[in-house]
């Protein structure tokens, strides 16, 4: 449901933020 969507969005945002801040090797 909507909570599942929010969870996925949050995880995606965290992954993107980590990539931008930490320069993670994975694209």
UniProtKB/Swiss-Prot annotation:
Belongs to the gastrin/cholecystokinin family. This is Caerulein precursor fragment R8. It is found in: Secreted. Expressed by the skin glands. It comes from Xenopus ruwenzoriensis. One of its GO terms (cellular component) is extracellular region. Antimicrobial peptide. Keywords: Amphibian defense peptide, Antimicrobial, Secreted. GO terms for biological process: defense response.
């Amino acid at each position: 449901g909507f909570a599942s969507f929010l969870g996925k969005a949050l995880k995606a945002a965290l992954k993107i933020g980590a990539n931008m801040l930490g320069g993670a090797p994975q694209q």
